[in-house]
UniProtKB/Swiss-Prot annotation:
Function (record text): AP-1 family transcription factor that controls the differentiation of lineage-specific cells in the immune system: specifically mediates the differentiation of T-helper 17 cells (Th17), follicular T-helper cells (TfH), CD8(+) dendritic cells and class-switch recombination (CSR) in B-cells. Acts via the formation of a heterodimer with JUNB that recognizes and binds DNA sequence 5'-TGA[CG]TCA-3'.
Region of interest (Disordered), ranges: 1-58
InterPro entries according to UniProt: AP-1, bZIP, bZIP_sf
Residue numbers of Phosphothreonine PTMs: 48
The entry's keywords: Activator, Cytoplasm, Differentiation, DNA-binding, Nucleus, Phosphoprotein, Repressor, Transcription, Transcription regulation
Domain bZIP: 26-89
Name used for this protein in its record: Basic leucine zipper transcriptional factor ATF-like
Annotated tissue distribution: Expressed at highest levels in lung, and at lower levels in placenta, liver, kidney, spleen, and peripheral blood. Detected in SW480 colorectal cancer cell line and several hematopoietic tumor cell lines, including Raji Burkitt's lymphoma. Strongly expressed in mature B- and T-lymphocytes. Also expressed in moderate levels in lymph node and appendix and at low levels in thymus and bone marrow.
Species whose genome carries this gene: Homo sapiens (Human)
Length: 125
């Protein structure tokens, strides 16, 4: 029996007395809260940084989208212009009148050395 009391005495010596237990728990709790506060602050900073990055990316994409819409509008106008030029040229063109219907690539390649009947500033050197 004395042996068992020694072991129980040694177990009491391993854990701090009740007053010290409370203060060490308090210290751990304060440390854990501080660590958690810092982790939460870092998480909020990362979230803010991510939102800022997404906002800048969104603005950049909006600018690209506006530029592409402007280019589409310009190309559509150019297409209308060239379609109009082609339509006004077809009745005057002897190459088109003499040829049989063929794919557009062939018709346009026949025009490679043909002088355009266009007096537009676009075609002026």
């Amino acid at each position: 029996m004395p042996h068992s009391s020694d072991s129980s005495d040694s177990s009491f010596s391993r854990s701090p007395p009740p007053g010290k237990q409370d203060s060490s728990d308090d210290v751990r709790r304060v440390q854990r809260r501080e660590k958690n506060r810092i982790a939460a602050q870092k998480s909020r900073q990362r979230q803010t940084q991510k939102a800022d990055t997404l906002h800048l990316e969104s603005e950049d994409l909006e600018k690209q989208n506006a530029a592409l819409r402007k280019e589409i509008k310009q190309l559509t106008e150019e297409l209308k212009y060239f379609t109009s030029v082609l339509n006004s040229h077809e009745p005057l063109c002897s190459v088109l009148a003499a040829s049989t219907p063929s794919p557009p690539e062939v018709v346009y390649s026949a025009h490679a050395f043909h002088q355009p009947h266009v007096s537009s500033p676009r075609f002026q050197p």
